[in-house]
Amino acid sequence: MLSVRVAAALARALPRQSGLVSKKALGAAFVATRNIHASGVWPPEKSGTAEVSSILEERILGADTTADLEETGRVLSIGDGIARVYGLRNVQAEEMVEFSSGLKGMSLNLEPDNVGVVGLANDKLIKEGDIVKRTGAIVDVPVGDELLGRVVDALGNTIDGKGPIGSKTRRRVGLKAPGIIPRISVREPMQTGIKAVDSLVPIGRGQRELIIGDRQTGKTSIAIDTIINQKRFNDGTDEKKKLYCIYVAIGQKRLTDADAMKYTIVVSRTASDAAPLQYLAPYSGCSMGEYFRDNGTHALIIYDDLSKQAVAYRQMSLLLRRPPGREAYPGDVFYLHSRLLERAAKMNDHFGGGSLTALPVIETQAGDVSAYIPTNVISITDGQIFLETELFYKGIRPAINVGLSVSRVGSAAQTRAMKQVAGTMKLELAQYREVAAFAQFGSDLDAATQQLLNRGVRLTELLKQGQYVPMAIEEQVTVIYAGVRGHLDKMEPSKITKFESAFLAHVKSQHQELLATIRADGKISEQADAKLKEIVLNFLSTFEA
């Protein structure tokens, strides 16, 4: 007779032989034995032992032996937003981890005996001894058209109070930049609507153009005006002309102006936010922009500003005990910005023909462009727009220094009409600045020098532009044409601004067909040139009167 005791021993032996040691399995064996014993089929028939064994084996193998395994560690120390965690042997760099309090962190330092984790929120809820578990996910953010018109934080969470984002697509924040093969040279214009930029330092789609200057010189104004100017293209039906915008505010005051929000994503990180979030925000915004680039459309991303991101990264690195270098920045601070800005690209037709244009902003101290971070970013980008405090206080706004500002690849993308009228303007303005410095020492100037000074003063006045009033490219062409061709040389400089607004109003109301021709053809034909000259001269005769 097979006793319950023997059956129990058999139940213990079976799973041990098959490598399945489980309380559930043992329990199933006991239940099976009890059921057989209760059925009263004793003594068993000749093959009873084999039947009992097979029944027990079926019950044991049918038991649920799955278990949720989690790799965990413990907090050794916590301070200044940095947690030292013991364990987590297989954690990846920049992997999200979760503390027992529910707060998220990101692993940055992978050391032999511990992991340095930066907290992505208030670290007051983290204590020594807390359990930390891996999530297995590298930091990623939601991407897609659903984000347009929304304000999100560095992790893609909404902070505008308009409910959750419906996007199902997510993308890692730290993706590799496209290589040489998928790219093509910059050839399409990215119009800012600012006369001084579109004529002198043109930007192309897929370019990286740095906006650099001291604080309070109008860097953010140029960026915001560029976003507002895209309204004229995004309101149209041509998808190839549309330019979606991502504005990454790093450590800036909270953005309240919602102009042109329907085609814009705002990634907001204020100065009061944790350093890791200020560090992540540009990469998050870049991933959102890459979604449009890789789907054959065009996007513009503005990083306002990368100086604050570098400071946040320096703060994190020093707290993680990484070796400091020049100006106490870590050795890889160049890589911090290069891996971000290299993701801006113009893709070839085989890869969809999309583009991502980057306008990084860098703040200088007392105009010192030779500091560490400014020189790094200047060497990475394809040109820079240099803003001067002195020009700003003189009332020349935007305060662009024409001599120091340059666009290395954008001229290939400049429209032919603008090239025709603005081709000589940069040279004339540079000569004017040079001569003006010497002219103040003496009054005996020859006629050619006097002419150069007169033209330079009027062109400088003509390039002044108010904030939040970007101009269409055909309107810019007509105004600059009047100045470059010498039609304004005899006008008082103080009247130039008044002339510009009156002339534009006249052209828009009376000569729409000329504007449409310049916009459609992208150039000034001989007939259009003659017509434009006639319009300017006729208007001047009535304006002067």
Curated annotation (Swiss-Prot):
Residue ranges of coiled coil: none
A UniProt-annotated Pfam family:
ATP-synt_ab_C
- Site positions (Required for activity) are 405
Q: Which InterPro entries match?
A: ATP_synth_asu-like_sf, ATP_synth_asu_C, ATP_synth_asu_C_sf, ATP_synth_F1_a_nt-bd_dom, ATP_synth_F1_asu, ATPase_a/bsu_AS, ATPase_F1/V1/A1_a/bsu_N, ATPase_F1/V1/A1_a/bsu_N_sf
Its topology with respect to the membrane? Peripheral membrane protein
Top-level taxon: Eukaryota
Binding, ATP: 216, 218-221, 465, 467
**Annotated residues for binding of Mg(2+):** 220, 304
GO molecular function, a single term: ADP binding
Q: Name one GO cellular component term.
A: mitochondrial inner membrane
CDD domains the record matches: ATP-synt_F1_alpha_C (cd18113), ATP-synt_F1_alpha_N (cd18116), F1-ATPase_alpha_CD (cd01132)
The biological process GO terms on file are: proton motive force-driven ATP synthesis
Q: Could you tell me where this protein is found in the cell?
A: Mitochondrion inner membrane
Record keywords: ATP synthesis, ATP-binding, CF(1), Hydrogen ion transport, Ion transport, Magnesium, Membrane, Metal-binding, Mitochondrion, Mitochondrion inner membrane, Nucleotide-binding, Transit peptide, Transport
Q: How does it assemble?
A: Homotrimer. Component of the ATP synthase complex composed at least of ATP5F1A/subunit alpha, ATP5F1B/subunit beta, ATP5MC1/subunit c (homooctomer), MT-ATP6/subunit a, MT-ATP8/subunit 8, ATP5ME/subunit e, ATP5MF/subunit f, ATP5MG/subunit g, ATP5MK/subunit k, ATP5MJ/subunit j, ATP5F1C/subunit gamma, ATP5F1D/subunit delta, ATP5F1E/subunit epsilon, ATP5PF/subunit F6, ATP5PB/subunit b, ATP5PD/subunit d, ATP5PO/subunit OSCP.
- Its biological function? Subunit alpha, of the mitochondrial membrane ATP synthase complex (F(1)F(0) ATP synthase or Complex V) that produces ATP from ADP in the presence of a proton gradient across the membrane which is generated by electron transport complexes of the respiratory chain. ATP synthase complex consist of a soluble F(1) head domain - the catalytic core - and a membrane F(1) domain - the membrane proton channel. These two domains are linked by a central stalk rotating inside the F(1) region and a stationary peripheral stalk.
So what family is this one in? Belongs to the ATPase alpha/beta chains family.
In Swiss-Prot or TrEMBL terms, this protein is called ATP synthase F(1) complex subunit alpha, mitochondrial
